[in-house]
Amino acid sequence: MQNERRIAQRFLEDKQLPYSSNELITMALTHPSYAQEKNTVANNQRLEFLGDAVLNLVVAEYLYNHYGRKAEGELTKIRAKVVCEDALAIFARNINLGQYLLLGRGEEMSGGRKRKSILADAVEAVIGAIYLDQGLETVQRFIIRQLEELISETASGDYYDYKSKLQELVQARDKENVSYAIIEESGPAHAKVFVAGVYYREQLLATGEGKSKKEAEQKAAQKVLQDNLVPGT
């Protein structure tokens, strides 16, 4: 149990999250396969259940407060896109959640750290843990910090997830992943410009520029798709 607690502690410190105890985060990072293998009761499924409800509440309240002119039906569609499995898997990747997960050997060997369903479930479990440990205000900041840009893009109708589409195409061919890195950053603090590169097996496929790291990565993935640079095509 000591090793599990150390991993949870590292996650909390790396993400600069306040906490009173790391017990809940340890549970949030524990996939059922690990709990079964180690013969422990605590896994992240109950926290996932709670986190799902908290996530929907936080996003719904944010939409209600920031998009007063949109009708109920529009708000429901926006929320659905923002809290779907694909969006939550991106959330998880943006905070490198996969590297902290406690997985059973079978899940580990089959690529569970990169599996969308596992990542999305773990995000919800972490949200549930933060809510129980620190309350609604803290978990609101954690969620909105990661989803605000996606909410804005989705609400404006401009959002298309090029990164997920590219990843799906690559994995369908050879089960590999593409990766992203910021290769240039310029401009003053209030008007930064980022250049991101998208890589496959350490080879640069394309670059993209944006006002945020996420936008630059999306632009890089978009260029790969539009210029037909997908590996294996």
From Swiss-Prot:
Residues 8-135 form the RNase III domain. Its cofactor is Mg(2+). The active site is at residues 52, 124. It is found in: Cytoplasm. InterPro entries: dsRBD_dom (IPR014720), RNase_III (IPR011907), RNase_III_dom (IPR000999), RNase_III_sf (IPR036389). Signal peptide: none annotated. The keyword Membrane does not apply. Residues 161-230 form the DRBM domain. It catalyses: Endonucleolytic cleavage to 5'-phosphomonoester. One of its GO terms (biological process) is tRNA processing. Its EC number is 3.1.26.3. Coiled coil: none annotated. Belongs to the ribonuclease III family. Homodimer. Digests double-stranded RNA. Involved in the processing of primary rRNA transcript to yield the immediate precursors to the large and small rRNAs (23S and 16S). Processes some mRNAs, and tRNAs when they are encoded in the rRNA operon. Processes pre-crRNA and tracrRNA of type II CRISPR loci if present in the organism. This is Ribonuclease 3. It comes from Syntrophomonas wolfei subsp. wolfei (strain DSM 2245B / Goettingen).
